[in-house]
């Protein structure tokens, strides 16, 4: 069932030092640690410009996954709060691969779940494919998104202005915490997926790298609810977050497959270097091409 307690703590410390980056070539990006625990205010699953100013905003901070089987729940996420990490889902991680797209494998007893994160080029869209590789019977999977909706250089805290409502759309819901932001469309390709509205603030997420640098590193994040669905062995479901709605959720699978097939594998130093270099070439909405000095500060 993943690592032993001592080994998992060693793995956690090492993994929190390793960060991943994927860009959309338009100034937007996904960046977090390889265990999906944000350690910087610049981290998030969707950080993107929302207008012509080129300023990037953290829209989607994270997505927490919970596996439910035989009446037991196993939260696969990892967050830092004052004095502790909770939940401690890193202990279920058995493998991480970066090519062709960041992929994490979890083992919970006899259940093995694979998560593939795909940031789409030339479109503000994140797709995550979950595949149940092994299981004695069907499992329930819950996906809970956490939102920030703030400038990437700032932090957000619980407030009465944030709109915690979710509006139903085909295949999911749309959310918008503040009226001057675009809608964020959350959809899946699972016909039987249900979104359970449960708006709530979660308090005091800590970003260790910010605190180490002498900056404020505490943030509150809002969740509007969670998706719940059933997965059978060898079945997959794809979660999509985008500032543009997908009219037909059944097309999500094909979109994911097409985008993934276009990714080149990073098999040697040269291919890794080429891949990394392309991350910093940006084409703005007005057609300008730029080379960024670096992510995340100059994105």
Regions found by a protein language model. Name each.
Residues 123-125, 135-299:
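Acidic/polar, glycine-enriched structural segments that form the non-catalytic walls/loops
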Residues 12-102, 184-192, 247-249, 253-260:
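An extended acidic
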Residues 78-121, 202-208:
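Extended, loop-rich substrate-binding clefts of extracytoplasmic carbohydrate-active enzymes
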Residues 1-7, 11:
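Single conserved hydrophobic/aromatic residue that forms the stacking wall/gate
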Residues 65-67, 102-107, 167, 229:
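Short acidic-hydrophobic surface loop/beta-edge motif
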Residues 70, 107-111, 135:
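Short strand-coil-strand connectors
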């Amino acid at each position: 069932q993943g690592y032993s307690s001592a080994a998992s703590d060693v793995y956690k410390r090492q993994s929190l030092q390793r960060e991943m980056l994927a860009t959309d070539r338009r100034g937007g990006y996904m960046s977090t640690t390889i265990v999906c625990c944000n350690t910087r205010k610049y981290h998030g699953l969707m950080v993107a410009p929302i207008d012509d100013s080129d300023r990037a905003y953290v829209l989607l901070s994270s997505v927490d996954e919970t596996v439910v089987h035989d009446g037991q729940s196993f939260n696969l996420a990892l967050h830092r709060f004052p004095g502790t990490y909770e939940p401690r889902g890193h202990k279920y991680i058995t493998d991480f691969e970066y090519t062709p797209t960041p992929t994490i494998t979890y083992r919970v007893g006899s259940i093995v779940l694979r998560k593939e994160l795909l940031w789409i080029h030339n479109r503000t869209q994140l797709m995550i494919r979950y595949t149940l590789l092994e299981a004695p019977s069907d499992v329930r999977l819950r996906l809970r998104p956490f939102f920030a909706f703030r400038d990437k250089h700032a932090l957000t805290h619980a407030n009465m202005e944030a709109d915690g409502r979710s509006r139903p759309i085909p295949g999911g819901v749309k959310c918008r915490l503040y009226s001057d932001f675009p809608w964020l469309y959350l959809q899946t390709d699972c016909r039987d997926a249900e979104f359970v509205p449960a708006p709530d603030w979660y308090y005091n997420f800590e970003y260790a790298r910010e605190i180490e640098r002498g900056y404020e590193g505490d943030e509150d994040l809002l969740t509007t609810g969670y998706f719940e669905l059933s997965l059978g062995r060898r079945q997959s479901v794809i979660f999509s977050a985008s500032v543009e709605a997908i009219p037909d959720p059944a097309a999500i699978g094909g979109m994911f497959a097409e985008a993934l097939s276009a990714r080149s594998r990073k098999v040697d130093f040269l291919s890794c270097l080429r891949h990394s270099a392309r991350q910093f070439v940006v084409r703005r909405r007005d057609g300008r091409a730029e080379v960024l000095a670096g992510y995340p500060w100059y994105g």
